[in-house]
């Protein structure tokens, strides 16, 4: 009980709730701006600092064929490759939603800095740009998919 009351005291004293609302809106605005050029991004949404980036099937025929190959292996394959690249290349831990494999969750702590949020925006922009423009993203991921099928 004391720990809970102490936590509530810190949340109130440091105004972490209102701060999360303000930073979250800024964060999603920056995400929308950074990801707007990419057709595979359907929507950026959220509340407070909890945000989601929803992806969609690519319109480009070459990318769509690769995406469909992923989807046949497992519906979560595309999202998991995004998660893998964010962690491996950017040292950022994120995950896909359990009820919609096309949504990447961003759930930074309430004490996150604006600079850290900007780092996330740049990191996800780089990974999405790679997925949208580079065959390397897809060929490496298809290799992963083949290994997953053989397990």
Q: What positions do the PLM features span?
A:
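Conserved N-terminal phosphate-binding loop of PLP-dependent enzymes in the Aspartate aminotransferase
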Residues: 1-151
